[in-house]
Amino acid sequence: MTMTLKRLALCVVCTFISICIQAQDVTREWVEQHYTKREVMIPMRDGVKLFTSIYEPVDATKPTPVIMQRTPYQASPYGEGYSYNLWNKLRNYARERYVIVLQDVRGRWMSEGEFVDVRPFIANKQSNKDVDEASDTYDTAEWLINNVKSNGNIGVLGTSYPGFYATMAALSGHPAIKAVAPQAPVTDWWMGDDYHHHGVLMITDMLNFVAQSFGRPRPVPTKTQTRMKPFFQDDEYSFFLREKTLKNITKIVGDSIAFWKDLMAHPDYDAFWQARDARRNIKDVKPAILLTGGLFDAEDCYGTWGVYKALKQQSPQTQTQFIMGPWFHGAWERDRGNHLGDIYFGANTSDFYLHEVEYNFFQYYLNGEGPKPDLDNHIYMFITGANEWKKFNQWPPKNSEPVNFYLQENGQLSNVVPQKANSFSQYTSDPNHPVPYTDEINKSKTREYMTHDQRFAERRPDVLTFRSEVLTEDVTLTGEIMADLQVAISTTDADFVVKVIDEFPEDFKYSQEIADKFNDGKPLTTIMGSYQMLVRGEVMRGRYRNSFEHPEGFKPGKVTQVKFALPDIAHCFQKGHRIVIQVQSTWFPLNDLNPQQFIDITQADEKDFIKSDIKIYHEKAHHSMITVNRLK
């Protein structure tokens, strides 16, 4: 079932006619006139009290629902000021006079207690000392039901880290929590969210996280917390290449960040990380769920897909809706969603989400108003390339089938198994000259790299590029991508990066009308002919090819399988385009450097980082490929 951009535009226009009539005055001044604010320390079962800002409508004639967000990022402003969220992303609920609740999670800002990053869920709580984010949500909900005038229904939402707390709210078991919307939820910080991908440390993101002072000692609740000074002033590539080792980075970070110590103490997927995988306890979920994510979310794309799959496998009875748009991290609540970098998606997809999807979800489950969710076709998926919304009843879609793309000699890519013997492509990976993830000079990672032009990488001798023939028809790929490489390396370890790329026709260019729409009228200087749009990319640390818990080295020169998953795809490679696969072993400084020896990377010295000669096989006996579903 397809929702074209024309239909989408019509929906957005109709929505705006109804929304704007009622919500055009939801400004700061309007909120301050129509809401009161009180600040409460809500007691938890173990005696710890959590700071909570409660915004209640002045006109409480009609009881309304509670909408809540729990956050480690401040339930500010503290005191008399009102949160800007009420006239921004929560404005629809302010218009409906919802009770709006913002809470500092345990151990953060004005809340008491000890903060624990992605605190593990305790499935079988034995006493009031067994507390987690789910129990804190339960206790908060219980207090709200007994102390705030409402209709008795509570909804919880949150993006990114607050998305993790939303997932925990869904596991709390409180009967008043009827609807939960985890958005780009942190789910597994080792396997694919934020700070690791398949065991590879996402070093740029991690250092930025540390600079936000997460995990620094906080003896007492506080309204202010000083951010650490930036670790470097020059560009990120130069800084991380100069420092190179995790030992050097540890010296810079210092000894006051508990979570950095945890990272260094747990390089493998051990019990520490497994306990922090939110998917493990997604079972028998009672509230309705609206799960939201971005196809180009550089931080928590993995977690969004992971929570959805866990819900369908472990809690199939849950009333679940799932939407993935052409968005970067959190774009649905703060951006137009019509482009990312040089790539244009068409209509304003974010307004469609806020007013047609999220708002209707909470109105139905909390207020008993609005259209009934279409649970038979519960998936809204934006197909990039085609730039259209489609609705599905399962993922991957029923009308899709697996297809293999085989790497071939001479840089070719096809659906035919290679027939030659002793056929491989080779490159040398040098940690002293790593492949950058972008050709731009930046102080920090940009969100646009997720669709960035990859032509710069093809020019590198340490990047292999395989391209299909020009497509004679549209090819829409959906679902998880499985990379299956047959490799031989000259050392005992290496990383493997696989990128799936959409290469535009040589004569492609945007019309001036389109260029003006997403470039704010500024001249579009990028040459779009033969543009290589990154659609998907993922890294795998070779030592984890057989087990994430128990790493093992390579035998130099031996042909070895390295198989790993890339995040799901929903992209149409249009007629006249090419499908391109790139393979490399560094992606810097997005990823930390591998010394390319089977040693403890956290303790590696600069002299330990050595070159590795890497062969990628494409022969009949050992063929490398990617497997993904193609929509019929």
Description of each model-found segment:
Residues D25-A60, R467-E473, F554:
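N-terminal cap/lid segment of alpha/beta-hydrolase-fold proteins
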Residues I343-G346, F352-V357, L366-K632:
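Glycine/threonine-rich phosphate-binding loop and adjacent beta-strand/alpha-helix elements that clamp
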Residues A298-W305:
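Conserved alpha/beta-hydrolase "acid-adjacent" motif
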Residues G79, N124, R242-R280, P287:
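Mobile cap/lid helix-loop segments that gate and shape the active-site cleft of serine hydrolases
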Residues V58-N146, D194-Y195, R334-F345, P505-Q512, ...:
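Cap/lid segment of the alpha/beta-hydrolase catalytic domain
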Residues G81, N85, F121-N128, L157, ...:
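A catalytic-pocket lid/entrance helix-loop region that shapes and gates access to the active site
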Residues V285, L291-G293:
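Short beta-strand/loop motif that positions the catalytic acidic residue
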Residues K149-S160:
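Alpha/beta-hydrolase fold nucleophile elbow
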